[in-house]
């Protein structure tokens, strides 16, 4: 019944989009006489090496927006509305649609001038713009042909700095600026970047009142050539009440005051405030230190906001401080820094009920969380989470109990600094780091077995904001899995029966100890490029200890510590995401996800929770979670095999075209490809082992459409995927369902929170 309903929903959506598309084709019938609908704007260039599309922002009139860069559905929706705005349907169609854009000759002329000036600013001083139109019925195509010509280049770049102190500060850095040893195009952007570079250097060297407006240029071009001689001038300091220009004043920090933001006071240790404050008496004023101080306090959970004000100290105070620091006036002036801190409530309690549905088994869960944001008066974040869950399991026969119960407790303690005996104070102040200790204990009681899991971890997280990098180091991370009871029925059916022997299955229901460490690095630049790599290993330290201490071994020949076999493996994960933005409404997201894990030494099989799975809302979306792979393997009777459909290697390739529809709704069209494989040959995973000669043929492919409800702070995602190539079948109609689609067999619906990548 559910499949049938989804089929009708699919048909309804198809005809809805088809109707709106047809409506968009007839929008010109509402164009007034003497006017033209601006159907398309095209930017061209007569120079092959000049990208005309980069200047699209200077065109004042844009055509109506398109879904997926092709379909003018918003315009078609607006055109479906009648003129009677008293009717609800007409107002609704106009609100979610888009008004037609009519060609305006004045806006076209102004756009030509804006485009010419933009090319001038890029160094094309002889640029021209040719404008033409093509009319078809009541629709008009506007064509802007850019003729940039040859760019002007900087032949000679000199500095005119009359302040000798500033000149000496800048001299070692001149090679980082506009250097005529390398060719530089004569662009406004290059000249402005040089102003910003110099301003930043001086702002970090005590020049508190300096800004880039004190820098200007003069340029001289030689007649008949495209070479330009440029001189940078740095003017003297001038105030409103001082007619005569003077040397730029240089400021030092004379005094720092910490001011609580409310009457209750901020209960932070002095050492914590000092470690996070880079503004100190006796140091030059530095804009970078100011921003770092803001960033440091923003990381402290005990502080709600920070406000830092500077005021120039009176002359008599400056004289006194000069004597203390052995400086002579008027070489320096002094600033008094007032740092106002306002703290948050230290204690919070949260309760979160949940409803669960695991393969049709209904249940409920509840989470109670307590947080203290200032445990030791150092803005340490302590949290303890209590979780309880209950689920009624259907379809089990031969078991005395049919309920699943879980109780867990997890405690975390975060320190907003790098806690290590080897780190320097300066590194701790600038590293933007967090150290975290976590301990957890989980009780799981199922009809088939009881499981107890103890975990403990110590990790560091720090970032380099300027380079858009984030690092995480886990040393160590401990997991102890204990199976106090396994049902005799479960043993007989799955673990002891010769016909069902499975190394992966047995290994998953044995006591296990994992001692691992890991390191990851993530790069994220302006939401356009994201790269993440992680490597982790387990059991190596224990293996070295075993070579000396000679641990006892179990029946499978595995070394044991505390009478439990330990896991040993190496794992590497890598992901890359690239977002190509065509316009404010349309973008293309490309994603690659690769992972490999190799068990060795004391382990023949990877721990179950470390194995890869395929399918689901964040993988190949034509399949449900765990429904795909490994390789060409397919579950018994076409059913999902929870244990066997896991692997040691994964590869996912995805492309998703994203478009804004209307209001909070976004749409997507996607193509996914990928699978998982095992590195070793297992009897119960036929066709699952990775080989270079077969893996391309075993890549699953799916396609589909998605609808997203974007509330900015979270996104609800609905994806409908269809199988295109199914590696579980080597040939025939089932191998290429894209040619012979069957909705009840090939369709998969996903609901998730957040984007897939």
Where are the regions a protein language model picked out?
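Interaction-mediating elements
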Residues: 2, 26-300, 305, 311, ...
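C-terminal motif of bacterial Sec signal peptides marking the signal peptidase cleavage site
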Residues: 21-24
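Transmembrane beta-strand segments of outer-membrane beta-barrel domains in Gram-negative
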Residues: 204, 331, 348, 399-595
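Outer-membrane beta-barrel pore domains and translocons
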Residues: 235, 280, 311-313, 342, ...
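Outer-membrane beta-barrel initiation region
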Residues: 242-428, 508-515, 523, 527, ...
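Repeated loop/turn-to-beta-strand initiation elements of outer-membrane beta-barrel proteins
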Residues: 303-306, 346-349, 374-382, 417-423, ...
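Extracytoplasmic gating/loop element in the C-terminal half of outer-membrane beta-barrel translocons
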Residues: 587-670, 678-682
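Outer-membrane beta-barrel "beta-signal"
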Residues: 709-713, 743-757
